[in-house]
Curated annotation (Swiss-Prot):
Coiled coil: none
Assembly behavior: Tetramer of two alpha and two beta chains.
Pathway where it operates: Amino-acid biosynthesis; L-tryptophan biosynthesis; L-tryptophan from chorismate: step 5/5
GO molecular function: tryptophan synthase activity
EC number: 4.2.1.20
Organism: Caulobacter sp. (strain K31)
Family: Belongs to the TrpA family.
Entry keyword set: Amino-acid biosynthesis, Aromatic amino acid biosynthesis, Lyase, Tryptophan biosynthesis
Active site: E51, E62
Name of the protein in question: Tryptophan synthase alpha chain
This protein's record includes keyword Amino-acid biosynthesis: yes
Gene3D superfamilies, alphabetized: Aldolase class I
Length: 275
């Protein structure tokens, strides 16, 4: 069962008393070969889990950085199947690092839930985050994913109240993704003082690790979140590096892995500073 990789990784992180570093990049940005090159380098750069976006024409939860990445991914010809092919390519050399696909419902719906889940499991996908699928409508997708051992990871936000929270975390597995700021990705900054009580509340409600994202751009912000959460997710800051390097005809893989390494070091040392 593929989601076991997620469970094993968080168990190992807990044993090491450190938070995980979760990276996000968009498939096909700027092209498939570069995405695969970055994917293969991320674990050595310090990524504990990897989120791989699949491009969609209307990414409503994303800020300008990820929207542009989705446009570049679509322009390069990236599809949902192409994204699965990238995961399969990554798995040829890495059987341990969990990979979570992140995107929107429409491409998965068009593929068919059972067909998608089977193909995702075969490729080596461990989890799925669907931004625009409310829990009330997620039953058939969850059934298909559970049959293949893939985690459906749900999003909780500062606006998720006590009445709604049980519905959000029901049938969630792997971890809970806490959206630390209201609004779209990569625009506002996460506030660790607000994050700590939210993480405690989500852990209690779900019994699962809590990863925090949507507002972590700097090593200092990543470290602050890593002190209180089970994982810190960084996306826009890495995608910015990809965009800038591609525009300047620089080595995209080299630049983004260097940035990932800086962030990973901050996450890994965060709790040591408290000791």
């Amino acid at each position: 069962m593929t989601k076991d990789r997620i469970d094993r990784r968080f168990a190992a992180l807990k044993a090491e008393n450190r938070a995980g570093f979760v990276t996000y990049i968009m498939a096909g940005d700027p092209d498939a070969a570069t995405t695969l090159s970055v994917l293969k380098g991320l674990p050595a750069a310090g990524a504990d889990l990897i989120e791989l976006g699949f491009p969609f024409s209307d990414p409503m939860a994303e800020g300008p950085t990820i929207q542009r990445a989705a446009q570049r991914g679509l322009k390069s010809g990236m599809t949902l199947q192409g994204t699965l092919d990238l995961v399969a390519g990554f798995r040829e050399g890495d059987a341990d690092t969990p990979i979570i696909l992140m995107g929107y419902l429409n491409p998965v719906l068009n593929r068919g839930f059972e067909s998608f889940a089977a193909a995702a499991a075969k490729a080596g996908v461990d989890g799925l985050i669907i931004v625009d699928c409310p829990p009330e409508e997620a039953g058939p997708l969850t059934d298909a994913l559970e049959a293949e051992g893939i985690a459906l990871i749900r999003l909780a936000a500062p606006t998720t109240d006590d009445k709604r929270l049980p519905m959000v975390v029901r049938r969630t597995s792997g971890f809970v993704y806490y959206v630390s700021v209201a609004g779209v990705t990569g625009v506002k900054s996460a506030d660790a003082a607000d994050v700590a009580p939210a993480v405690a509340r989500l852990r209690k409600a779900s019994g699962l690790p809590v990863a925090v994202g949507f507002g972590i751009r700097t090593p200092a912000q990543a470290a602050a979140v890593a002190r209180v959460a089970d994982a810190a997710v960084v996306g826009s800051a890495l995608v910015d590096e990809i965009e800038a390097a591609a525009q300047l005809n620089e080595n995209v893989t080299e630049k983004v892995l260097l940035k990932a390494s800086e962030l990973a070091k901050a996450v890994r040392s965060a709790r040591l500073e408290l000791a």
